[in-house]
Amino acid sequence: MAQILKFPPQASKLGFKRVRKRSRPTENDDQLNLFPAPVAQILNLESGLSSFEQALMLDERGDLKAEELYIKAIEEQDCVADACCNLGIIKSHQGDALKAFDCFTTSLKHNPRHSEAHYNLGNLYFEANDFRLAQIHFEMASEVDPAFANAYFNLALVQAINNDFSAALVALSKYQQLVPKEEGRIAEELLQTIRKSLAVLKNSRA
């Protein structure tokens, strides 16, 4: 009989992750890059900032003009993957899941190893109850960026939902290793819940 895993109240998934720095274009790790391609950048003469940098600054202040500047950055080919990713978060907060999905997938077209885009796409699939695809993207996010703590937490949630309790324990332990002790406490009750579920599962097989 399938078991229903009851999560503690604070075990809801962690939210979307905005890109806060410029990411370099995808490179082949096996190939020495002697001539790195320049990143397209059109500076605003008044502020000295590119469209992406202006958008990010406004976005972090909660200014609605950020959306317009992310679109401008994309048109100018300025940090396209990052701009698409952050625009996707804005669209998600506006309740436009389809547009958010389009933004995150476009980000991955420009940079298939964009950890934040994988993570945010995983969150969209999670909210749509497509836990299989959510798990794939959380796994990709943690693989691309092994220090991406939130990816491990959400991965553990999905793995627990998918009854892969052993893997969930590993992911949650990794999360606790990466965050300060205070933040790691939100995982304690979830760890206990997963351990109990794993024990019940083992006993049922005995």
Regions inferred by a protein language model and the residue ranges of each:
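Long, contiguous interaction/recruitment modules in multidomain scaffold/adaptor proteins
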Residues: 1-49
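Residue-level recognition of tetratricopeptide repeat
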Residues: 47, 80, 114, 148, ...
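Structural signature of tandem alpha-helical TPR/SEL1-like repeats
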Residues: 60-72, 93-106, 127-140, 162-174, ...
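Alpha-helical segment of the N-proximal tetratricopeptide repeat
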Residues: 41-82, 93
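Structural marker of alpha-solenoid helical repeat scaffolds
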Residues: 76, 110, 144, 178-179
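Intrinsically disordered, low-complexity regions flanking the DNA-binding domain
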Residues: 180-181, 188-192
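Conserved alpha-helical positions within TPR/SEL1-like repeat arrays
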Residues: 52-59, 82-93, 116-126, 150-157, ...
